Amino acid sequence: MSTWANLGLQDSASPLMEQLIFFHDHALLILVMITVLVGYLMVMLFFNSYVNRFLLHGQLIEMIWTILPAIILLFIAMPSLRLLYLLDEINEPSITLKSIGHQWYWSYEYSDFNDIEFDSYMIPTNELSNDGFRLLDVDNRIVLPMNSQIRILVTAADVIHSWTIPALGVKVDGTPGRLNQTNFFINRPGLFYGQCSEICGANHSFMPIVIESVPVNYFIKWISDKVNS
């Protein structure tokens, strides 16, 4: 989860988020190099004493400043396109989770099992335990197995919502009447926090998401307890 004064991205918990971080660093490095070069040229332009009143054009330099930006854009665009295709690819899922956005809470259904569905509300500050996180903890967490391909189907019952978990690199819009899907792979256990990322009304800030990633055997036990209860 994001912490105080954190200027970087959250620690990744999925291969897709790792790739997003790599691309961010790759693009940022190119932007820093361009900024330094342009800044250096501007400083030299203002402070040097060389003047040429007869310099009307320079074909070589014009070719360079036309071709070089095109090459730089290719170095940014190719990894970006590769990542876009990776994010949209749906592998064979082990589990399908359905998420429905409401004003202002989430409801979940485990489509592979019978009668496992629940609503997830934010815990109010006055009911929060000492180790809870304000505006982030919920009464019913999503429990998912680690090291498994998980497909999520997202929709909404009223207005547009957006189901987002930054540590997993997942952001899916929930639109009434439409079913959007994506998949992710959690590679470590832990609690991963997210929030609705589409302004959806007065209490938009109060519909958090919490995923509890557990080993497969713990997940099977949790499913068994839910089915038998």
From Swiss-Prot:
Keywords assigned: Copper, Electron transport, Magnesium, Membrane, Metal-binding, Mitochondrion, Mitochondrion inner membrane, Respiratory chain, Translocase, Transmembrane, Transmembrane helix, Transport
SUPFAM superfamilies per UniProt: Cupredoxins, Cytochrome c oxidase subunit II-like, transmembrane region
Binding site for Mg(2+): 198
Mitochondrial intermembrane-facing ranges: 1-26, 83-229
UniProt keyword Transmembrane helix, yes or no: yes
Enzyme class: translocase
UniProt xrefs under Pfam families: COX2, COX2_TM
Segments crossing the lipid bilayer: 27-48, 63-82
Reactions catalysed, as given in the entry: 4 Fe(II)-[cytochrome c] + O2 + 8 H(+)(in) = 4 Fe(III)-[cytochrome c] + 2 H2O + 4 H(+)(out)
Name under which the protein is recorded: Cytochrome c oxidase subunit 2
Keyword Acyltransferase included in the entry's annotation: no
Membrane topology, from the record: Multi-pass membrane protein
Organism per entry: Drosophila subobscura (Fruit fly)
One GO term (biological process): ATP synthesis coupled electron transport
Cofactor requirements of the protein: Cu cation
